[in-house]
Amino acid sequence: MSKTIQANNIEALGNAMDLALERDPNVVLYGQDAGFEGGVFRATKGLQKKYGEERVWDCPIAEAAMAGIGVGAAIGGLKPIVEIQFSGFSFPAMFQIFTHAARIRNRSRGVYTCPIIVRMPMGGGIKALEHHSETLEAIYGQIAGLKTVMPSNPYDTKGLFLAAVESPDPVVFFEPKKLYRAFRQEIPADYYTVPIGQANLISQGNNLTIVSYGPTMFDLINMVYGGELKDKGIELIDLRTISPWDKETVFNSVKKTGRLLVVTEAAKTFTTSGEIIASVTEELFSYLKAAPQRVTGWDIVVPLARGEHYQFNLNARILEAVNQLLK
């Protein structure tokens, strides 16, 4: 019987990075405070001491340089893991990620690849202003050549991260801060992967498909299995990968239920929820029994302190949308 460990999301992530560094000498890791301090959330705690400063090191506050160094290192044969402290700090790095990391394979006609992982803590959970609480997955998700991942539980966090390490192409790895230490889960202690691009069917039902990912999954699972949405025939899907997203799983579910609700913390306009609904409407219109709906964050700058509650607390609106769709 395989050995298992109890881990929360931050511990599962640290375990994955430890295994990656141990198995492959080409893996390197760096970021602001990622070395000596073990990262702002302590995801990399102890790794510099174990693997040395040549493989795990600290960087200045220079996200563009961090990403650019990673691109060059990846082209040169290393597998860099770059920690951006918060996803909102990644704006200076976008030029390097979008125009170089994502395009190297195409630009070189396959001669070079860019196996870089850019880690980005995202979303609410610490009641911090603006850049500390951004939800930017739609921006990264539309960039050809990038894979964009967002796990919601320790098992997927470890498995998806190790799959990202194996990817020959760049992966943006979003980490919901509010779930870092929200709960523990029994996961394999050994190396394993979860396929990038494959959604997870959490619950089966015949009345309504709910598609979500990342920080909203914890509350949705509790609502479906023991709360206000219990016994309502909900088919709950954890997307896990934003790009490429698993159309097949979502489409098969909507064909069965005829109803769709997409739930995300991100803003409503020009985001992932709209892409999913547009795709379903374009390709499955004849299957729909009701107009698809979405529950999202507001189209505003993330507010400070207690204001975060009004941006990211979606449960009452989820219940209202479900009742409307099931009328």
UniProtKB/Swiss-Prot annotation:
Domain of life from the UniProt record: Bacteria
Cofactor(s) of this protein: thiamine diphosphate
Protein name, per record: Pyruvate dehydrogenase E1 component subunit beta
Entry's EC annotation: 1.2.4.1
Reaction equation(s) it catalyzes: N(6)-[(R)-lipoyl]-L-lysyl-[protein] + pyruvate + H(+) = N(6)-[(R)-S(8)-acetyldihydrolipoyl]-L-lysyl-[protein] + CO2
Alphabetical UniProt keywords: Oxidoreductase, Pyruvate, Thiamine pyrophosphate
SUBUNIT field: Heterodimer of an alpha and a beta chain.
Function: The pyruvate dehydrogenase complex catalyzes the overall conversion of pyruvate to acetyl-CoA and CO(2). It contains multiple copies of three enzymatic components: pyruvate dehydrogenase (E1), dihydrolipoamide acetyltransferase (E2) and lipoamide dehydrogenase (E3).
Upper taxonomic lineage: Bacteria, Bacillati, Mycoplasmatota, Mycoplasmoidales, Mycoplasmoidaceae
GO cellular component terms, A-Z: attachment organelle membrane; cell surface; cytosol; external side of plasma membrane; membrane
